[in-house]
């Protein structure tokens, strides 16, 4: 039983107008020509102005305006590029067409998701792990589920995140009111425990040095580092959570890329059902980034400090804030989990894995220190002594390639770039050639290039 406590008192989501910076009010009045008497949510005031991916998009557009005739290649945001297998889309198409008939029309479904799909998810991904279909909550994607889980957690909990980490964990925590203000000097939010995960600790936090928090956000395979936690490490994490009465929010969105037998689910670890919620997605697994389909697992054994089942509260939140995933998307999800669908999906994922290998071989040959990339689509490339946004700009300006600055994932990401294996093969090959030409002709200018590479 976890010792997480929730309070019924309302969180301070608003304050007097005098606490709103004058510059912010001036901005609103200038943009709108006036204002209401509604006071802005003070938690939104805490957010940094530039969320990572919109800022990358802004710089990308500026670059296109500056260089309108060049081919820009993205090795950046983790969007899939290959077509969804026809076997899956035809099933979705047939279902959609059926909506135009009396026999095939379907309206609202269960907020928790189609029963057949929930059963298929439990049997496909959690066979022999004791996950039941009633514990599966089908959604419109993992990122949406993270926000709904924040509604469950509330503003009075303490949180820990890997550093570097996927930005949505922290930003959603800021919005719900779990954090203090952002410190420019440390690049950290108050009231958040940042767990360093880098080469010095095999990208797994030193739990002996980690203070207790109510909630631990943990992603494996990790975005952005590309590392997957070993079975031994996840045993340590579960034991740590049980000792402290904490809940783990385990993000397994990239589990399909694991190749070495490492755990694909936190529930492979004994005792995890008592302390962990798992969030996952069809986005990277099946190329559903635009279709939008995911799921969360809330075990029956997961309880509040007073013994009340957490699954009951999450069900209430889902039925209040969500009318269920698209029935067309859910039809596609069922097709994905058929034997033929799984075979086609594996073929597409192998394509991305080959892309990743091409990029890995290229970067290693250049003497760069490359981490990750074995059980995930992402490479985590170290540029020692350099600011990640500076390296991002330098590569963009000279090669017309988009990457992702590591500092956007937290202070532990400074000096790194995330490079993605998602992309068309011809773009991956062309990008590799450009990177080779760029670094080979400029080696003497870069202190972060070494004669030996360091890969995992």
Swiss-Prot record:
Q: How is the cofactor bound?
A: Binds 1 pyridoxal phosphate per subunit.
Q: Which cofactor does it need?
A: pyridoxal 5'-phosphate
Q: Which keywords annotate this record?
A: Aminotransferase, Chloroplast, Plant defense, Plastid, Pyridoxal phosphate, Transferase, Transit peptide
InterPro entries for this protein: Aminotransferase_I/II_large, DapL/ALD1, PyrdxlP-dep_Trfase, PyrdxlP-dep_Trfase_major, PyrdxlP-dep_Trfase_small
Quick one: which residues bind pyridoxal 5'-phosphate?
A: 108, 142-143, 223, 251, 254, 281, 283, 292, 323
Enumerate the Gene Ontology biological process terms.
Answer: defense response to bacterium; L-pipecolic acid biosynthetic process; leaf senescence; systemic acquired resistance; systemic acquired resistance, salicylic acid mediated signaling pathway
**Top-rank taxon, per record:** Eukaryota
Broad enzyme group: transferase
Transit peptide, from-to: 1-43
- Its EC number is 2.6.1.-
Q: In which tissues is it expressed?
A: Highly expressed in senescing leaves, flowers, siliques and seeds.
Q: Where in the cell is it found?
A: Plastid, Chloroplast
Please give the chief subcellular localization of this protein: plastid
Function text: Aminotransferase involved in local and systemic acquired resistance (SAR) to the bacterial pathogen P.syringae. Required for salicylic acid (SA) and camalexin accumulation upon pathogen infection. Possesses aminotransferase activity in vitro and may generate amino-acid-derived defense signals in vivo. May be involved in ethylene-induced senescence signaling. Involved in the biosynthesis of pipecolate (Pip), a metabolite that orchestrates defense amplification, positive regulation of SA biosynthesis, and priming to guarantee effective local resistance induction and the establishment of SAR.
Family stated for the protein in its record: Belongs to the class-I pyridoxal-phosphate-dependent aminotransferase family. LL-diaminopimelate aminotransferase subfamily.
What does the record's miscellaneous section state?
Answer: Treatment with exogenous pipecolate (Pip) enhances disease resistance to Pseudomonas syringae pv. maculicola. Plants over-expressing ALD1 exhibit resistance to Pseudomonas syringae pv. maculicola.
Q: What is this protein called?
A: Aminotransferase ALD1, chloroplastic
Q: Could you tell me which species this protein originates from?
A: Arabidopsis thaliana (Mouse-ear cress)
Highest lineage ranks of the organism?
A: Eukaryota, Viridiplantae, Streptophyta, Embryophyta, Tracheophyta
């Amino acid at each position: 039983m976890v010792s997480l406590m929730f309070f019924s008192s309302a969180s301070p989501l608003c304050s007097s107008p005098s606490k709103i910076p004058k510059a912010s009010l001036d901005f609103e009045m200038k943009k709108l020509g006036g204002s209401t008497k509604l006071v802005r949510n003070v938690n939104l005031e805490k957010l940094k102005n530039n969320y990572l991916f919109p800022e990358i998009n802004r710089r990308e557009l500026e670059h296109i305006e500056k260089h309108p005739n060049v081919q820009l290649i993205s090795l950046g945001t983790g969007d899939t590029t290959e077509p969804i297998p026809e076997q899956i889309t035809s099933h979705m198409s047939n279902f959609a067409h059926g909506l135009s008939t009396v026999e095939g029309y379907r309206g609202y479904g269960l907020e928790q998701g189609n029963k057949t799909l929930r059963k298929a998810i439990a049997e496909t991904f959690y066979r022999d792990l004791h996950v039941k279909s009633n514990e599966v909550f089908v959604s419109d994607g993992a990122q949406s589920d993270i926000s709904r889980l924040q509604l469950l957690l509330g503003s009075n909990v303490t949180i820990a995140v890997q550093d570097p980490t996927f930005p949505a964990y922290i930003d959603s925590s800021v919005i719900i009111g779990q954090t203090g203000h952002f410190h420019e000097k440390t690049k950290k939010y108050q009231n958040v425990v940042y767990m360093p995960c880098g080469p010095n600790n095999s990208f797994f936090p030193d739990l002996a040095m980690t203070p207790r928090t109510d909630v631990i956000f943990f992603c494996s395979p990790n975005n952005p580092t590309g590392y997957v936690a070993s079975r031994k490490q996840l045993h340590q994490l579960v034991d740590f959570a049980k000792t402290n009465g904490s809940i783990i929010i385990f993000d397994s969105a990239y589990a399909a890329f694991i190749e070495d037998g490492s755990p694909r689910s936190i529930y492979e670890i004994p005792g995890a059902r008592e302390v962990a919620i798992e969030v996952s997605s069809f986005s990277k697994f099946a190329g559903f980034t635009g279709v939008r389909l995911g799921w969360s697992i809330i075990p029956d054994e997961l309880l509040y400090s007073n013994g009340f089942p957490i699954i009951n509260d999450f069900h209430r939140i889902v039925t209040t804030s969500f009318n269920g995933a698209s029935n067309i998307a859910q039809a596609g999800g069922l097709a994905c989990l058929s034997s033929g669908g799984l075979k086609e999906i594996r073929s597409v994922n192998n394509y991305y894995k080959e892309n990743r290998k091409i990029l890995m071989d290229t970067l290693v040959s250049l003497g760069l220190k490359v981490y990750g990339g074995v059980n995930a689509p992402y490479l985590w490339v170290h540029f020692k002594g350099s600011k990640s946004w500076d390296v991002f700009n330098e590569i963009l300006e000279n090669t017309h390639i988009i990457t992702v600055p590591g500092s956007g994932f937290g202070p532990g990401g400074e000096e790194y770039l995330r490079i993605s294996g998602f992309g068309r093969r011809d773009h991956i090959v062309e990008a590799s050639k450009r990177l080779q030409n760029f670094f080979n002709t400029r080696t003497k200018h870069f202190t972060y290039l070494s004669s030996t590479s360091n890969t995992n």
